[in-house]
C-alpha cells in the first residue's frame, strides 16, 4: 500500500508512517471517508501494535473520542466493532479499554439506534465465548444491553 497522506498513514500505515505526516492537529477530518483521524485508526487491524501506538498518541494529543461520523453518527467504538470483523480478541479488548479510558460514550446511539455493544455482538464474527471478556468489560463499565 502506498502511503500518500496522513489519512492513508493512520488507516494503513505504521506509527512512523503516521508521524511523518502528523502536523499537530489530532482532530483532522477526512471528508471523503467521513471520519476523523482517530476513527480511521480503528477501521482495520492491520499492524495491531502500530494501531495501538497511534491510538494512544492521538488520545494523548487530545483527539475527540466522541466525535460522531456525520453520515451514521458513530463514535470510534461503533466504527471499530462495525469495521474489524475478525480481530484478535486481545486486540479487541485493548482498543475497547483505551477508548473507554479516554471517555468514549459506550451508550451513544448511532443513526440506527445501536450502541457499540450491539455491533460487538452482531457485526464481529468471532465466537461468543472468545469475545466474552469484551462484552463483560463493556457491561462492567456501564454499557446498556
What are the residue ranges of the model-derived segments?
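Acidic (E/D-rich), amphipathic helical modules within compact regulatory domains
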Residues: 40, 44-50, 57
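Residues within HEAT/ARM-like alpha-solenoid scaffolds
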Residues: 46-50, 71-72, 87-94, 129, ...
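Ankyrin-repeat boundary/"N-cap" motif
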Residues: 1-6, 29-44, 68-85, 109-124
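Ankyrin-repeat-protein effector appendages
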Residues: 1-6, 128-145
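Ankyrin repeat domain, specifically the short helix-to-loop turn at the C-terminus of the second helix
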Residues: 19-27, 54-64, 94-105, 134-144
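Helix-turn-helix repeat elements of alpha-solenoid scaffolds
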Residues: 10-17, 52-56
